[in-house]
C-alpha cells in the first residue's frame, strides 16, 4: 500500500514511489501495481505518470489516530478513490460541492470501508484491511482481541498468515465458503437460513459502523452513500438502509467510478486546476 501522506489528490510517479512499491515498504496490496504499470507505459510513450487518491489517503483528524494502546496508531486505509469520486457526484446532484458537504460513504465490495467526509476531507475511516468495523465477504472486521491472540498463538501463525487470514479468508468466506453475494442470495432464496443469518449479520455490523461515522460528523450529514459492487444487491441495500434512514437520506451509487476518477484527477492537473504533488517531498508517516 502507498505510504500515509497528509496530502491528497494526484501525485507524479517518481523513483522513490516505485522503489517503495516494489519493496512493499508499507504493505502488500494489488493496488501497489498501479503506479508500476503506469510507469511502464509512461516510459514507452515519453509522458508523465500519475496516481490519484490512493487507498491510503490520510486526512484523519488528530483524535482519529488514537488506537487505545501507546505505540500503535490507527491507519487511514479505505477505498478513497471511489469514495471521493462518488461523494463529488452526489454533492453535484444535491447542488453543492464536495467541499461544502458532509457525507458518510460506505464502499461495499470484497472489502468494506467507510469514510466520514467533512467539507472535502476524509476525517475518519473504518479501516477494513487492518481489522476494523464490519466483517465483509472475505475480511474479518473487528475481532475479540484476547480470543484472537490466543488463537494465533495456538495455531503458531506468522504475521503474513494473519494478514492473509483477516483480509482474505474471513467474513462470509469463513462462515459460508462463498464470497459472491449473488450465490449467497440464491442460497437464501432456496431457504438456506445459515446464509441468511450471516448476510444479515454483515449488514447489521455495517449499520453499526455508519452510526460510528455519524458521531464523527456530529449528526450534520447531507447523505449516507452506499457504493461498490455489493450496492447492486437490493437485499444488502435494504438491510442496511432500514437501520440508518433516521440518520440521513440514503443515496445508492452501485459499482465504482474509479476509472473516471483517475481520468478526472489527472485532467485537473493537465488543465491547471490542480498541481500534481511530489511524492518524494510528501510528509510520510512510517508504519
Cite the ranges covered by each PLM segment.
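Glycine-rich phosphate-binding loops at beta-strand->alpha-helix junctions
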Residues: 221-240
